[in-house]
Amino acid sequence: SVRPWGDPRAKQVWKKPMAVMVDRYSASASEIFAGAIQDYQRGIIIGQKTFGKGTVQRLDNLTTGQIKITESKFYRITGSGMQSKGIHPDITLPSTWDIEEIGESSYDTALQWDEIRPVRFKKFSMESSLIAQLNDEHLVRVNQSPNLQYILDIRKRYEIQKNKKVISLNLTNRRIEKDERQSWALDIENKRRSSLNLQIFSSYKAM
């Protein structure tokens, strides 16, 4: 059965602009909150796609332990499920790693996304063009921000390491790789600091 939950007597206690930050580790209740803010167009969601936990569990006691049983699912007011898909941000921030490696969608036995009939609700009057404008400005900022470029540099390195097919166990080779890794880390950190007019590090150990 489907049971809608709401509070018709609720009052708006904050009337100024709102932004909610999320990442891949945002799950369950935080996804309900972010999804409601997005669906009501009450504010903008910033960050990365969330975990995608749209289910409710209960623990039953056994003679030798406990068993966790999934007993229900929760949905957005639009009828869209959160399970596996999560909440997609209005403005996406770069990540240093592949967020698809974790989350409900990464589990072989996870319940799949679905949807139900939406409920009636009234949206706030946020202009639809605002998000498009903010995204355009964000893309410019990504290309100009030393901190965001630093994150993208780490992500490139992550992808290279992730796709390596062979890992040497030779001690000499491992030491060479360690020196190269430290040199790379020093280079990108000093590149970021130089762009921000900060004092650069003389060595990896000084970081």
Language model regions located:
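C-terminal "post-core" interaction segments
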Residues: S1-M207
